[in-house]
């Protein structure tokens, strides 16, 4: 299947951070659900811009497509690069307060993943990075931050 077929088959819609998604389980603005899950599809010409979650852990699971790089900057400024694919890591855990972003390094095709967030995802605990603020915190990662932030 190609990206368009997955988007149609799974009923995906545009995501605020880039790519396409569909909530599968657990959106809970009351904070009572233990977790939430989504399908998330990223195309070669898009990215998941740097963002972080407060008080929530996110786990990404590879399903199909091209390898996906996930860039993670911890609060101390240490950068880790994880590649989700059939040949590399099949899942990656992102801890609360870590800035992270994702892209398809080959710039072709798409990648379909599943994401689980615990406790359940709440938009009030989601923060999209401001490029200038991230550059002040982590100037050593300037090239990556400039490429993986939207503003």
Regions flagged by a language model, labelled:
Residues 1-92, 101, 108-110, 119-122, ...:
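Non-catalytic, conserved peripheral segments adjacent to functional cores
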């Amino acid at each position: 299947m190609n990206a368009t077929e997955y988007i149609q088959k799974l009923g995906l819609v545009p995501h605020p951070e880039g790519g396409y998604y569909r909530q599968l389980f657990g959106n809970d603005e009351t904070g009572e659900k233990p977790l939430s899950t989504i399908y998330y599809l990223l195309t070669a010409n898009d990215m998941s811009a740097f963002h972080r979650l407060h008080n929530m852990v996110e786990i990404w699971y590879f399903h199909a497509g091209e390898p996906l790089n996930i860039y993670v900057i911890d609060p101390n400024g240490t950068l880790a690069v994880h590649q989700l694919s059939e040949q590399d890591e099949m899942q990656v855990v992102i801890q609360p307060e870590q800035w992270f972003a994702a892209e398809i390094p080959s710039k072709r095709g798409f990648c379909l993943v599943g994401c689980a967030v615990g406790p359940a995802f709440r938009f009030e605990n989601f923060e999209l990075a401001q490029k200038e603020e991230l550059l002040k915190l982590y100037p050593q990662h300037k090239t990556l931050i400039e490429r993986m932030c939207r503003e």
